[in-house]
A protein has these predicted regions:
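Short aromatic/hydrophobic "clamp" motif used to bind/position activated sugar donors
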Residues: 127, 139
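Conserved nucleotide-sugar donor-binding
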Residues: 135-137, 210-224
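Acidic donor-binding/catalytic loop of UDP-sugar-dependent glycosyltransferases
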Residues: 92, 142-159
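Acidic donor-binding segment of Leloir-type glycosyltransferases
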Residues: 69-118
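N-proximal low-complexity "stem/linker" segments adjacent to membrane-targeting elements
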Residues: 1-68
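Membrane-embedded multi-pass helical conduit in multi-pass membrane proteins
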Residues: 5, 13-31, 292-371
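Catalytic donor/gating beta->alpha subdomain of glycosyltransferases that bind UDP-sugars
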Residues: 160-193, 219-222, 227-289, 384-387
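Cell-envelope/extracellular polymer assembly enzymes that use nucleotide-activated donors
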Residues: 50-53, 81, 239
Protein backbone atom coordinates (compact mmCIF):
# COMPACT_ATOMS: atom_id res chain seq x y z
CA UNK A 1 0.00 0.00 0.00
CA UNK A 2 2.84 2.39 0.84
CA UNK A 3 4.35 1.80 -2.60
CA UNK A 4 1.02 2.59 -4.23
CA UNK A 5 0.76 5.86 -2.30
CA UNK A 6 4.33 6.68 -3.36
CA UNK A 7 3.38 6.05 -6.99
CA UNK A 8 0.36 8.33 -6.65
CA UNK A 9 2.70 10.93 -5.16
CA UNK A 10 5.04 10.59 -8.13
CA UNK A 11 2.07 10.99 -10.47
CA UNK A 12 0.91 14.12 -8.63
CA UNK A 13 4.43 15.56 -8.75
CA UNK A 14 4.74 14.81 -12.48
CA UNK A 15 1.35 16.40 -13.10
CA UNK A 16 2.50 19.51 -11.23
CA UNK A 17 5.84 19.80 -13.08
CA UNK A 18 4.28 19.23 -16.51
CA UNK A 19 1.66 21.89 -15.70
CA UNK A 20 4.39 24.35 -14.70
CA UNK A 21 6.16 23.58 -17.97
CA UNK A 22 2.95 24.22 -19.89
CA UNK A 23 2.72 27.63 -18.23
CA UNK A 24 6.33 28.38 -19.16
CA UNK A 25 5.68 27.27 -22.75
CA UNK A 26 2.70 29.64 -22.91
CA UNK A 27 4.87 32.49 -21.60
CA UNK A 28 7.53 31.53 -24.16
CA UNK A 29 4.92 31.60 -26.92
CA UNK A 30 3.81 35.09 -25.86
CA UNK A 31 7.45 36.24 -25.94
CA UNK A 32 7.90 34.64 -29.37
CA UNK A 33 4.95 36.58 -30.81
CA UNK A 34 6.11 39.82 -29.18
CA UNK A 35 9.62 39.35 -30.58
CA UNK A 36 8.14 38.46 -33.98
CA UNK A 37 6.22 41.75 -34.12
CA UNK A 38 9.37 43.68 -33.27
CA UNK A 39 11.35 41.73 -35.87
CA UNK A 40 8.71 42.44 -38.52
CA UNK A 41 8.87 46.16 -37.73
CA UNK A 42 12.67 46.10 -37.98
CA UNK A 43 12.50 44.11 -41.23
CA UNK A 44 10.23 46.71 -42.82
CA UNK A 45 12.91 49.34 -42.23
CA UNK A 46 15.76 47.39 -43.86
CA UNK A 47 16.83 49.01 -47.14
CA UNK A 48 19.86 46.96 -48.13
CA UNK A 49 20.31 43.26 -47.52
CA UNK A 50 23.85 41.83 -47.56
CA UNK A 51 24.71 39.07 -50.05
CA UNK A 52 24.35 35.56 -48.63
CA UNK A 53 25.82 32.11 -49.30
CA UNK A 54 23.37 29.25 -48.72
CA UNK A 55 25.10 25.94 -47.86
CA UNK A 56 23.12 22.73 -48.43
CA UNK A 57 24.44 19.19 -48.05
CA UNK A 58 22.38 16.64 -50.02
CA UNK A 59 22.18 12.86 -49.78
CA UNK A 60 20.10 10.63 -52.01
CA UNK A 61 16.62 11.01 -53.50
CA UNK A 62 14.70 12.27 -50.50
CA UNK A 63 10.93 12.73 -50.64
CA UNK A 64 9.92 16.01 -52.34
CA UNK A 65 13.58 16.81 -53.01
CA UNK A 66 12.83 18.87 -56.12
CA UNK A 67 10.19 20.96 -54.33
CA UNK A 68 12.49 21.47 -51.35
CA UNK A 69 15.35 22.66 -53.55
CA UNK A 70 13.13 24.94 -55.64
CA UNK A 71 12.13 26.84 -52.51
CA UNK A 72 15.73 27.98 -52.08
CA UNK A 73 16.01 29.13 -55.70
CA UNK A 74 12.78 31.15 -55.39
CA UNK A 75 13.87 33.44 -52.58
CA UNK A 76 12.71 37.05 -52.56
CA UNK A 77 16.24 38.22 -51.83
CA UNK A 78 18.48 40.58 -53.82
CA UNK A 79 21.78 38.67 -53.99
CA UNK A 80 22.64 35.15 -52.91
CA UNK A 81 24.41 32.02 -54.08
CA UNK A 82 23.70 28.37 -53.27
CA UNK A 83 26.37 25.75 -52.65
CA UNK A 84 25.49 22.05 -52.65
CA UNK A 85 27.69 19.22 -51.41
CA UNK A 86 27.46 15.44 -51.60
CA UNK A 87 29.88 12.73 -50.55
CA UNK A 88 29.85 10.94 -53.92
CA UNK A 89 29.89 12.10 -57.53
CA UNK A 90 27.10 9.65 -58.42
CA UNK A 91 24.78 10.73 -55.60
CA UNK A 92 21.32 10.79 -57.19
CA UNK A 93 20.50 14.05 -55.39
CA UNK A 94 23.04 15.89 -57.56
CA UNK A 95 21.06 15.06 -60.71
CA UNK A 96 18.06 16.81 -59.19
CA UNK A 97 20.24 19.74 -58.07
CA UNK A 98 21.55 20.19 -61.63
CA UNK A 99 18.06 19.90 -63.13
CA UNK A 100 16.62 22.53 -60.80
CA UNK A 101 19.61 24.89 -60.99
CA UNK A 102 19.41 25.02 -64.81
CA UNK A 103 15.85 26.34 -64.52
CA UNK A 104 17.03 29.08 -62.17
CA UNK A 105 20.23 30.02 -63.97
CA UNK A 106 20.07 33.57 -62.56
CA UNK A 107 21.04 32.19 -59.12
CA UNK A 108 24.78 31.42 -58.82
CA UNK A 109 25.21 27.76 -57.91
CA UNK A 110 28.21 25.60 -57.00
CA UNK A 111 28.36 21.83 -56.54
CA UNK A 112 31.01 20.07 -54.48
CA UNK A 113 31.83 16.39 -54.12
CA UNK A 114 33.61 15.86 -50.83
CA UNK A 115 34.52 12.18 -50.89
CA UNK A 116 34.40 10.18 -47.67
CA UNK A 117 34.23 12.74 -44.82
CA UNK A 118 37.48 12.55 -42.82
CA UNK A 119 35.80 13.99 -39.72
CA UNK A 120 33.58 11.97 -37.38
CA UNK A 121 30.74 14.46 -38.00
CA UNK A 122 29.99 14.45 -41.77
CA UNK A 123 27.72 17.54 -41.88
CA UNK A 124 30.34 19.67 -40.11
CA UNK A 125 32.92 18.61 -42.70
CA UNK A 126 30.52 19.33 -45.55
CA UNK A 127 29.76 22.82 -44.21
CA UNK A 128 33.47 23.48 -43.80
CA UNK A 129 34.22 22.56 -47.42
CA UNK A 130 31.37 24.69 -48.73
CA UNK A 131 32.31 27.66 -46.54
CA UNK A 132 35.78 27.68 -48.11
CA UNK A 133 34.21 28.37 -51.50
CA UNK A 134 31.44 30.66 -50.24
CA UNK A 135 31.92 34.20 -51.52
CA UNK A 136 29.82 36.04 -48.95
CA UNK A 137 30.20 37.04 -45.31
CA UNK A 138 26.87 35.57 -44.21
CA UNK A 139 26.38 31.80 -44.39
CA UNK A 140 22.96 30.15 -44.13
CA UNK A 141 23.09 26.41 -43.54
CA UNK A 142 20.07 24.16 -43.69
CA UNK A 143 19.29 20.48 -43.66
CA UNK A 144 18.25 18.84 -46.92
CA UNK A 145 14.81 17.90 -45.57
CA UNK A 146 13.34 21.38 -45.10
CA UNK A 147 10.96 23.46 -47.21
CA UNK A 148 11.06 27.25 -47.08
CA UNK A 149 8.86 30.17 -48.12
CA UNK A 150 10.08 33.00 -50.42
CA UNK A 151 10.59 35.38 -47.46
CA UNK A 152 12.85 32.88 -45.65
CA UNK A 153 16.21 34.54 -46.31
CA UNK A 154 14.92 38.06 -45.59
CA UNK A 155 13.53 37.10 -42.20
CA UNK A 156 16.47 34.90 -41.20
CA UNK A 157 19.22 37.29 -42.29
CA UNK A 158 17.73 40.58 -41.03
CA UNK A 159 18.75 40.12 -37.34
CA UNK A 160 22.39 39.69 -38.45
CA UNK A 161 22.44 43.36 -39.46
CA UNK A 162 22.88 44.04 -35.74
CA UNK A 163 26.66 43.95 -35.06
CA UNK A 164 26.05 42.22 -31.73
CA UNK A 165 24.21 39.28 -33.34
CA UNK A 166 26.42 36.45 -34.55
CA UNK A 167 23.88 33.73 -35.35
CA UNK A 168 20.18 33.19 -36.09
CA UNK A 169 18.21 29.95 -35.92
CA UNK A 170 14.58 28.87 -36.47
CA UNK A 171 11.86 26.70 -35.03
CA UNK A 172 10.05 24.39 -37.42
CA UNK A 173 6.86 22.42 -37.91
CA UNK A 174 6.90 18.78 -38.92
CA UNK A 175 5.32 17.77 -42.22
CA UNK A 176 4.26 14.12 -42.29
CA UNK A 177 4.67 12.34 -45.64
CA UNK A 178 4.64 8.67 -44.60
CA UNK A 179 1.82 7.65 -42.25
CA UNK A 180 1.39 7.04 -38.53
CA UNK A 181 4.97 6.66 -37.25
CA UNK A 182 6.15 9.58 -39.32
CA UNK A 183 3.21 11.57 -37.97
CA UNK A 184 4.34 10.99 -34.38
CA UNK A 185 7.75 12.44 -35.21
CA UNK A 186 6.23 15.37 -37.09
CA UNK A 187 3.88 16.43 -34.29
CA UNK A 188 6.74 16.00 -31.81
CA UNK A 189 8.72 18.54 -33.83
CA UNK A 190 5.83 20.98 -33.96
CA UNK A 191 4.89 20.75 -30.29
CA UNK A 192 7.46 19.10 -28.02
CA UNK A 193 10.57 20.44 -29.75
CA UNK A 194 9.12 23.92 -30.18
CA UNK A 195 7.93 24.09 -26.57
CA UNK A 196 11.40 23.20 -25.33
CA UNK A 197 12.98 25.89 -27.50
CA UNK A 198 10.43 28.51 -26.39
CA UNK A 199 11.05 27.77 -22.71
CA UNK A 200 14.84 27.86 -23.17
CA UNK A 201 14.57 31.18 -25.03
CA UNK A 202 12.33 32.54 -22.25
CA UNK A 203 14.52 31.49 -19.33
CA UNK A 204 18.05 32.05 -20.61
CA UNK A 205 17.92 33.21 -24.23
CA UNK A 206 19.16 31.21 -27.20
CA UNK A 207 22.47 29.53 -26.47
CA UNK A 208 22.24 26.81 -29.13
CA UNK A 209 21.31 26.25 -32.74
CA UNK A 210 18.69 24.11 -34.49
CA UNK A 211 20.00 22.17 -37.49
CA UNK A 212 17.19 22.89 -40.00
CA UNK A 213 18.45 26.49 -40.24
CA UNK A 214 21.49 28.31 -38.91
CA UNK A 215 22.53 31.70 -40.30
CA UNK A 216 25.95 32.83 -39.13
CA UNK A 217 28.52 35.54 -39.79
CA UNK A 218 31.92 34.33 -40.97
CA UNK A 219 33.57 36.54 -38.35
CA UNK A 220 31.63 34.81 -35.57
CA UNK A 221 32.46 31.43 -37.06
CA UNK A 222 36.14 32.36 -37.20
CA UNK A 223 36.01 33.45 -33.55
CA UNK A 224 35.13 29.88 -32.51
CA UNK A 225 37.71 28.27 -34.81
CA UNK A 226 35.52 27.51 -37.83
CA UNK A 227 33.53 24.40 -38.60
CA UNK A 228 36.51 22.20 -37.78
CA UNK A 229 35.86 22.97 -34.11
CA UNK A 230 32.61 21.04 -34.52
CA UNK A 231 34.18 18.11 -36.37
CA UNK A 232 33.89 15.51 -33.62
CA UNK A 233 30.80 16.77 -31.79
CA UNK A 234 27.64 14.70 -32.21
CA UNK A 235 25.29 17.70 -31.84
CA UNK A 236 27.11 20.16 -34.09
CA UNK A 237 24.01 22.37 -34.43
CA UNK A 238 23.72 22.75 -30.66
CA UNK A 239 27.45 23.38 -30.25
CA UNK A 240 27.80 26.11 -32.87
CA UNK A 241 25.20 28.21 -31.06
CA UNK A 242 26.69 27.39 -27.68
CA UNK A 243 30.20 28.42 -28.77
CA UNK A 244 29.08 31.57 -30.58
CA UNK A 245 27.12 32.65 -27.50
CA UNK A 246 30.18 31.94 -25.33
CA UNK A 247 32.29 34.05 -27.72
CA UNK A 248 30.19 37.10 -26.83
CA UNK A 249 27.74 37.25 -29.72
CA UNK A 250 23.96 37.16 -29.43
CA UNK A 251 22.11 34.16 -30.84
CA UNK A 252 18.62 35.06 -32.08
CA UNK A 253 15.53 32.90 -32.53
CA UNK A 254 13.98 34.08 -35.81
CA UNK A 255 10.26 34.68 -36.16
CA UNK A 256 10.39 32.59 -39.33
CA UNK A 257 8.98 29.06 -39.12
CA UNK A 258 10.19 26.51 -41.65
CA UNK A 259 8.76 23.15 -42.64
CA UNK A 260 10.63 19.95 -41.79
CA UNK A 261 9.60 17.11 -44.10
CA UNK A 262 9.34 13.80 -42.23
CA UNK A 263 9.33 10.50 -44.11
CA UNK A 264 9.80 7.64 -41.66
CA UNK A 265 8.17 4.59 -43.18
CA UNK A 266 8.16 2.28 -40.18
CA UNK A 267 8.68 2.07 -36.43
CA UNK A 268 12.40 1.24 -36.68
CA UNK A 269 13.25 4.31 -38.78
CA UNK A 270 11.19 6.49 -36.45
CA UNK A 271 12.84 4.99 -33.37
CA UNK A 272 16.38 5.41 -34.72
CA UNK A 273 15.73 9.10 -35.39
CA UNK A 274 14.04 9.75 -32.05
CA UNK A 275 16.78 7.87 -30.21
CA UNK A 276 19.50 9.83 -32.02
CA UNK A 277 17.89 13.17 -31.11
CA UNK A 278 17.48 12.11 -27.49
CA UNK A 279 21.11 10.97 -27.34
CA UNK A 280 22.13 14.29 -28.83
CA UNK A 281 20.37 16.34 -26.15
CA UNK A 282 21.43 13.97 -23.39
CA UNK A 283 25.08 14.63 -24.15
CA UNK A 284 24.92 18.26 -25.25
CA UNK A 285 22.58 19.45 -22.46
CA UNK A 286 22.84 16.77 -19.73
CA UNK A 287 21.12 18.72 -16.94
CA UNK A 288 18.31 20.00 -19.12
CA UNK A 289 17.80 16.58 -20.66
CA UNK A 290 17.57 14.93 -17.25
CA UNK A 291 15.05 17.54 -16.10
CA UNK A 292 12.99 17.04 -19.25
CA UNK A 293 11.81 13.76 -17.74
CA UNK A 294 9.48 15.90 -15.62
CA UNK A 295 7.80 17.74 -18.50
CA UNK A 296 5.93 14.75 -19.92
CA UNK A 297 2.31 14.47 -18.80
CA UNK A 298 0.67 11.28 -20.05
CA UNK A 299 3.08 8.81 -18.36
CA UNK A 300 2.33 10.40 -14.98
CA UNK A 301 -1.39 10.43 -15.71
CA UNK A 302 -1.38 6.73 -16.56
CA UNK A 303 0.76 5.94 -13.52
CA UNK A 304 -1.69 7.83 -11.33
CA UNK A 305 -4.65 6.04 -12.88
CA UNK A 306 -3.23 2.55 -12.26
CA UNK A 307 -1.98 3.30 -8.73
CA UNK A 308 -5.17 5.09 -7.66
CA UNK A 309 -7.41 2.28 -8.95
CA UNK A 310 -5.27 -0.22 -7.02
CA UNK A 311 -5.87 1.90 -3.91
CA UNK A 312 -9.61 1.90 -4.55
CA UNK A 313 -9.66 5.57 -5.59
CA UNK A 314 -10.68 5.45 -9.27
CA UNK A 315 -11.94 9.03 -9.16
CA UNK A 316 -8.48 10.30 -8.27
CA UNK A 317 -6.94 8.17 -11.01
CA UNK A 318 -9.33 9.46 -13.66
CA UNK A 319 -8.70 13.03 -12.50
CA UNK A 320 -4.93 12.59 -12.88
CA UNK A 321 -5.31 11.04 -16.33
CA UNK A 322 -7.76 13.73 -17.38
CA UNK A 323 -5.38 16.46 -16.23
CA UNK A 324 -2.57 14.88 -18.25
CA UNK A 325 -4.66 14.61 -21.42
CA UNK A 326 -5.92 18.19 -21.05
CA UNK A 327 -2.34 19.37 -20.53
CA UNK A 328 -1.22 17.81 -23.82
CA UNK A 329 -4.25 19.09 -25.73
CA UNK A 330 -3.53 22.64 -24.56
CA UNK A 331 0.17 22.36 -25.40
CA UNK A 332 -0.68 21.00 -28.85
CA UNK A 333 -3.04 23.91 -29.50
CA UNK A 334 -1.03 26.72 -27.90
CA UNK A 335 2.37 25.73 -29.29
CA UNK A 336 1.77 23.44 -32.26
CA UNK A 337 -0.92 25.67 -33.73
CA UNK A 338 -0.41 28.95 -31.89
CA UNK A 339 3.31 29.25 -32.71
CA UNK A 340 4.27 27.08 -35.69
CA UNK A 341 0.80 26.89 -37.29
CA UNK A 342 0.72 23.12 -37.70
CA UNK A 343 -2.88 22.20 -38.65
CA UNK A 344 -2.36 18.63 -37.39
CA UNK A 345 -1.64 19.97 -33.90
CA UNK A 346 -4.99 21.77 -34.01
CA UNK A 347 -7.17 19.05 -35.52
CA UNK A 348 -5.47 15.80 -34.44
CA UNK A 349 -4.30 16.89 -30.99
CA UNK A 350 -4.88 13.35 -29.65
CA UNK A 351 -1.84 12.29 -31.67
CA UNK A 352 0.35 14.44 -29.44
CA UNK A 353 -0.83 12.57 -26.35
CA UNK A 354 0.49 9.36 -27.93
CA UNK A 355 3.68 11.13 -28.93
CA UNK A 356 4.07 12.36 -25.33
CA UNK A 357 4.00 8.80 -24.00
CA UNK A 358 6.44 7.64 -26.68
CA UNK A 359 8.68 10.60 -25.90
CA UNK A 360 9.00 9.48 -22.29
CA UNK A 361 10.07 6.00 -23.43
CA UNK A 362 12.66 7.48 -25.79
CA UNK A 363 13.91 9.78 -23.02
CA UNK A 364 14.39 6.83 -20.65
CA UNK A 365 16.06 4.77 -23.39
CA UNK A 366 18.53 7.59 -24.09
CA UNK A 367 20.30 6.64 -20.86
CA UNK A 368 21.13 3.20 -22.24
CA UNK A 369 24.26 2.55 -24.28
CA UNK A 370 26.51 4.97 -26.13
CA UNK A 371 25.60 4.36 -29.75
CA UNK A 372 23.31 6.08 -32.23
CA UNK A 373 22.32 5.71 -35.90
CA UNK A 374 22.11 8.46 -38.52
CA UNK A 375 21.42 7.67 -42.18
CA UNK A 376 23.71 4.74 -43.03
CA UNK A 377 26.21 5.40 -40.25
CA UNK A 378 26.52 4.11 -36.69
CA UNK A 379 28.15 6.30 -34.08
CA UNK A 380 29.91 5.43 -30.87
CA UNK A 381 29.86 8.30 -28.39
CA UNK A 382 31.82 9.39 -25.37
CA UNK A 383 30.17 12.35 -23.71
CA UNK A 384 29.16 14.83 -26.42
CA UNK A 385 31.94 13.67 -28.77
CA UNK A 386 31.95 11.02 -31.48
CA UNK A 387 34.73 8.49 -30.92
CA UNK A 388 33.95 6.29 -33.93
CA UNK A 389 31.73 6.43 -37.03
CA UNK A 390 31.06 3.24 -38.99
CA UNK A 391 29.34 2.95 -42.34
CA UNK A 392 29.36 0.71 -45.40
CA UNK A 393 32.41 -1.25 -44.36
CA UNK A 394 34.50 1.75 -43.32
CA UNK A 395 35.11 3.40 -40.00
CA UNK A 396 36.33 6.84 -39.00
CA UNK A 397 37.82 7.51 -35.60
CA UNK A 398 37.85 10.92 -34.00
CA UNK A 399 41.04 12.82 -34.67
CA UNK A 400 42.02 10.79 -37.75
CA UNK A 401 42.42 12.32 -41.16
CA UNK A 402 41.39 11.36 -44.63
CA UNK A 403 41.98 12.59 -48.13
CA UNK A 404 38.93 14.54 -49.25
CA UNK A 405 38.02 14.56 -52.91
CA UNK A 406 36.62 17.86 -54.07
CA UNK A 407 35.24 18.51 -57.52
CA UNK A 408 33.70 21.98 -57.46
CA UNK A 409 31.51 22.75 -60.42
CA UNK A 410 29.78 26.05 -60.92
CA UNK A 411 27.52 27.79 -63.34
CA UNK A 412 25.94 31.20 -63.40
Amino acid sequence: VLILYLLVGVALFGTLTSTIFLGLALAGAIKFHRDARQASDALSRVKDFPPVSVLKPVHGLEVRLKEKLEGFFRQDYPAYEILFAADEENDSALDVVREVSVRYAQIPCKILVNGIPPWPNPPAYSFSRMSELAENEILVTSDSDVEVAPNYLREVVAPLLDPKVGMVTCVYRGKNTAGFWSGLTAIGMSVEMTAGVLVANLLEGMKFGLGPTIAVKKEALARIGGYQTLGDYFANDFMIGHLIDAAGYHVVLSQHVIEHVVHQKNFQVMWDNQFRWAKSTRYSRPKGHFGSGLIFALPYGLLGLVAAIALGKPGLGLALLGAAVLNRILESWLVGWGVVRDPVALKEFWLYAIRDFLGFIVWAASYTGARAVWRDSRYELRGDKIVLRKNAGTSQAAGSSGAPQSHPNSHH
